[in-house]
Amino acid sequence: MRILKPCLRSTCIQCYLCLLLNSHFLTEDGIHVFILGCISAGLPKTEATWQHVISDLKKIEDLIRSIHMDATLYTESDAHPNCKVTAMKCFLLELRVILQESRNSDISDTVENLIILANSSLSSIEYKTESGCKECEELEEKNINEFLKSFIHIVQMFINPS
């Protein structure tokens, strides 16, 4: 069925919505819902901290030592502070390599959690477009232990910006 007058329909929907809300907020429970909704809209968003990312990285480091995983990954060893977001994105892409190469469920779960934590922490940061930074493929390939040490160093740059 095709509606010929969408403007009229949206007006009707707005009227029904207004009537529904007006009747709902006349009750005491409706007022409580409204007040709690306003309060929750003003609460700060809970975000993952970079400390959790570091603890996951250390856990991955221990797990990799225990299973003797050997991989070479693109690693940013001396990132400029103005390129830390670009470097972090490269590290997160390389984590996916660990995810694919690892057959250990503990490592896979921890890596997936770390990717989610780091991405949510990154999304809360306002940053300018970084220019003059190396692309991921331009970085030197290093073993997984060096990769994790450099990753921790980059995360610390987010914790202690200087």
UniProtKB/Swiss-Prot annotation:
GO cellular component: extracellular space
Residues making up the propeptide: 30-48
Record lineage: Eukaryota, Metazoa, Chordata, Craniata, Vertebrata
Signal peptide: 1-29
InterPro entries: 4_helix_cytokine-like_core, IL-15, IL-15/IL-21_fam, IL-15_mml
Matching Gene3D superfamilies: Interleukin-15/Interleukin-21
Residues bearing carbohydrate: N119
Transmembrane segments: none
GO biological process: immune response; interleukin-15-mediated signaling pathway; neutrophil activation; positive regulation of cytokine production; positive regulation of immune response; positive regulation of peptidyl-tyrosine phosphorylation; positive regulation of phagocytosis; positive regulation of T cell proliferation
Disulfide bonds: C83-C133, C90-C136
Protein name as annotated: Interleukin-15
Localization (cell): Secreted
Primary location: secreted
Keyword entries, A-Z: Cytokine, Disulfide bond, Glycoprotein, Secreted, Signal
GO molecular function list: cytokine activity; cytokine receptor binding
Family: Belongs to the IL-15/IL-21 family.
PANTHER family, alphabetized: INTERLEUKIN-15, INTERLEUKIN-15-RELATED
Stored Pfam families: IL15 (PF02372)
Summary of the function given for this chain in its UniProt record: Cytokine that plays a major role in the development of inflammatory and protective immune responses to microbial invaders and parasites by modulating immune cells of both the innate and adaptive immune systems. Stimulates the proliferation of natural killer cells, T-cells and B-cells and promotes the secretion of several cytokines. In monocytes, induces the production of IL8 and monocyte chemotactic protein 1/CCL2, two chemokines that attract neutrophils and monocytes respectively to sites of infection.
Gene: IL15
